[in-house]
Amino acid sequence: MEGAPTVRQVMNEGDSSLATELQEDVEENPSPTVEENNVVVKKQGPNLHNWSGDWSFWISSSTYKDRNEEYRRQFTHLPDTERLIADYACALQRDILLQGRLYLSENWLCFYSNIFRWETTISIALKNITFMTKEKTARLIPNAIQIVTESEKFFFTSFGARDRSYLSIFRLWQNVLLDKSLTRQEFWQLLQQNYGTELGLNAEEMENLSLSIEDVRPRSPGRSSLDDSGERDEKLSKSISFTSESISRVSETESFDGNSSKGGLGKEESQNEKQTKKSLLPTLEKKLTRVPSKSLDLNKNEYLSLEKSSTSDSVDEENVPEKDLHGRLFINRIFHISADRMFELLFTSSRFMQKFASSRNIIDVVSTPWTAELGGDQLRTMTYTIVLNSPLTGKCTAATEKQTLYKESREARFYMVDSEVLTHDVPYHDYFYTVDRYCIIRSSKQKCRLRVSTDLKYRKQPWGLVKSLIEKNSWGSLEDYFKHLESDLLIEESILNQAIEDPGKLTGLRRRRRTFNRTAETVPKLSSQHSSGDVGLGTKADITGKKKEMENYNITLIVVMSIFVLLLVLLNVTLFLKLSKIEHAAQSFYRLRLQEEKSLNLASDVVSRAETIQNNKDQAHRLKGVLRDSIVMLEQLKSSLIMLQKTFDLLNKNKTGMAVES
């Protein structure tokens, strides 16, 4: 942790005015005080906004009510305006592991543990956090988070979903550092993300609830929405250098964010900062008629709000509703392809999709034509087989994809398609499915914007380890899939524009795109692979041959395994027969021994004393004979030893005489 810049150091590098504001806030919230039981308690300064007291009327979930009441009861020193946003089961590493719960609100991070009436209470103001990282328990298990303040370090471990918990805390921490307050709509969106399945409301009621809460959102007197938006944009432009440096510092340990956060904040920030300064007034006027912009996003799409503020070369994008899914945004860029051409490439049996399916090892593709539904939407169904290389999922899996073209779509202007994908042969396939949303927005006659967002849906709730395994594999596969799709679309874009544009313009266009796009480094390699056009296109004969080879391989494997199992069964039968024979022989020998012992006992009772004396005499006579023979043998041995000794003496004398003569 040495060398990690503190909040004040980073703020001094960015803007002195914003640093002064945060410095005043830190002074209002003093450093933690350590009590006798090593409990850290921090006091909160005056809050920037006040929540209305009628918000709890809408909560129908007793679980959230219980959590919030428990939170208020355990942390009575916090202001009444603090509302619980999320809570996680974890443990604090001290001399021993203190198992408890971590509570997250808008301005505070609190921990409570009660082990045999030994209570531990910790309250950390988010603005006092200087650094936070993902850690590993015992340098092996990735389930820990370390929180660092100016005076202490807190090591929380045993998280069920470490990456999600870290992301939530990190976003609220950044929100506090930027001096942003949650709106009521944002607060309810966070509750939906953390307690959505336990609130007891359906999606339509949740949406109406968010809109009604937004309509009655309190405002401070004498302050218009234009002033509020202007102040927010001004603070955002002032602190843009601070956020970029802070996020880049933490992104080294944030493997869960992947390339989307790097592409959003790392490379587009300087461009959006300039555009925000140039078009500040038009942006503020738009905010008066639209829903307020989000100050944070727990779905890993930090650059969405910045992307929306940038101006495009057409007015069509502004009039199109952007409805991304709540998961992740994988593609968001403008292609030099018309909107209708993009739709044909992605949602028809085009040569592009055939090549793309072949490169992704997708075979046996069968699709139905677009059919109109009663509600005005259009439906298309696809079935195919995905050849897999993972040892955990098998050789291949069948998949069904249901594509829905919504009635809000306008030909050659705007297309919104939802793709629901179900895989049938992967582990835990009955627990989850994925939903992809494609938004094709016309920018100009030969340009369109493609936005692809994805969400992971659950049919039934799995337990923690299974859920983390599903999310890890699913998000990794989806990210690789859409990176490949974006790269192939760039190649197709260059092929389509090659006949229209001059070579010089095309070279300049590629050069500019290479410096802007996060996936442009992979484009030259892919273009060299697909430069021949139809080289990667697999014919039906090739697909059939691959399928037959796979079937033959499976049959051969089954035959070999059957023979092996049969041999094992025969070996077990042989061993069983031998073991039974050995057991029978042992029982026979035991019975014979018992009979001999019984006969000896009976003989000893019948034999008379005279016979016993005679036997004793006979034994004594035999012993005398043995002793006599032993004595004779000892005498012979003695004579032999004497002769041997004489022989050795004679040899020694001869050797001594020879030595003297020499």
Swiss-Prot record:
It holds the Pfam family VASt. InterPro entries: Cholesterol_transport, GRAM, PH-like_dom_sf, VASt. Residues 1-34, 212-237, 250-284 are annotated as: Disordered. Residues 265-276 have a biased composition (Basic and acidic residues). It is a single-pass membrane protein. The chain crosses the membrane at residues 557-577. GO terms for molecular function: cholesterol binding; cholesterol transfer activity. Residues 69-136 form the GRAM domain. Keywords: Cell membrane, Endoplasmic reticulum, Lipid transport, Lipid-binding, Membrane, Transmembrane, Transmembrane helix, Transport. GRAM domain binds phosphatidylserine in the PM and mediates protein recruitment to endoplasmic reticulum-plasma membrane contact sites (EPCS) in response to excess cholesterol in the PM. PANTHER family: GRAM DOMAIN CONTAINING 1B, ISOFORM E, PROTEIN ASTER-C. Cholesterol transporter that mediates non-vesicular transport of cholesterol from the plasma membrane (PM) to the endoplasmic reticulum (ER). Contains unique domains for binding cholesterol and the PM, thereby serving as a molecular bridge for the transfer of cholesterol from the PM to the ER. Plays a crucial role in cholesterol homeostasis and has the unique ability to localize to the PM based on the level of membrane cholesterol. This is Protein Aster-C. It comes from Pongo abelii (Sumatran orangutan).
